[in-house]
Amino acid sequence: MESENNSVKSKSISRKKKIHNNSNDLEIDPKVTPINVSELEQIQRDQLIVIAEEKAVDFAENLSKQELIYNILKKQSEKNGAIIAGGVLTVVEDGFGFLRSNKLVPGPSDVYVSQSQIRKLGLRSGDYVVGLVRSPKDQEKYYGLLRVERVNDMTSEEAKRRPNFEDLTPIFPDEKITLETDKPNDSLSQRIVDIFSPVGKGQRALIVSPPKAGKTMLLKSIANGITSNNKDVHLMVLLIGERPEEVTDMRRSVEGEVIASTFDEPVEDHTRVTEVALERAKRLVEAGTDVVILMDSVTRLARAYNL
């Protein structure tokens, strides 16, 4: 996605690209391999140490994972190499925003997005934005977004033409979501839901049962049925107040996007993550994607809003 206030010029002498963004100039050397921040965050610490040593980072073995990423990006900036970052946009009350990829909560790897970029490109909370960023300057806390490449896997012009979620017309469900699969561990519960309580696209459903009755197991079974039989559906599993090990188990069991705020995190994170996840789903619907949100649990979310 291209930002209209960014222009790219080439110099035949230095063979570098000069990018202008809000009066900030950055020299990009095409000979230096670009680094993707999101990919670095997925790499294990041992592999990061190898990359850091290749970048000549001092005392790499003594650094934490977050410190390794920071120093790798710092060395990349010193060599005028491109840094690519992506995350879900959160717009604050003052009009500017942040790209967040780590559990959708504030963190040191957030990318600052200016108010002018948000207005000019029509960005909204919940957009997944990928772009070129720069390292923090003196007395700055966050990376800065220089140029937007993609928004929800669309170009900037395509993103500008998308409708608003509030302007879409709600209709009754007219397409069934089939859950039954050939997996023996899941097929019985999936078939029972298909027969006695069929679910359609656009429908809301609530699972009510006492504690320890197997709601989470049923939720995983439903999630696997959705991903197996409905490849065009984007599945989001939202876990609020769960134990960290249950979140890990869900991520290993389900192919969809798992978003979580565990019980040991502040209640403010519970509400913030829920609201950002809902905005993320709206942006996907605006792009023409069918979205299913499975949340566990409504009780803990209501408790978080009441505290």
Predicted regions span which residues?
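Phosphate-binding glycine-rich loops and their immediate beta-loop-alpha structural context
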Residues: I171-F172, I177-T274
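Short nucleic-acid-contacting surface segments enriched for D/E, G, S/T with interspersed K/R
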Residues: Q117-V130
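Glycine/charge-rich, flexible interdomain linkers and switch-proximal surface loops
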Residues: E67-I69, N80-G95, S135, Q139-N152, ...
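Short, charged beta-turn/beta-strand-edge "cap" motif at the junction between a beta-strand
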Residues: L104, Q117, V133-Q139, P211-K212
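Conserved P-loop NTPase nucleotide-binding/switch module
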Residues: R252-I259, F263, V267-L307
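Residue-level signature of catalytic and energy-coupling elements of molecular machines
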Residues: L48, L68, G97, S114, ...
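P-loop NTP-binding catalytic core
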Residues: L123, R134-I207
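Charged, low-complexity terminal tails
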Residues: M1-V113
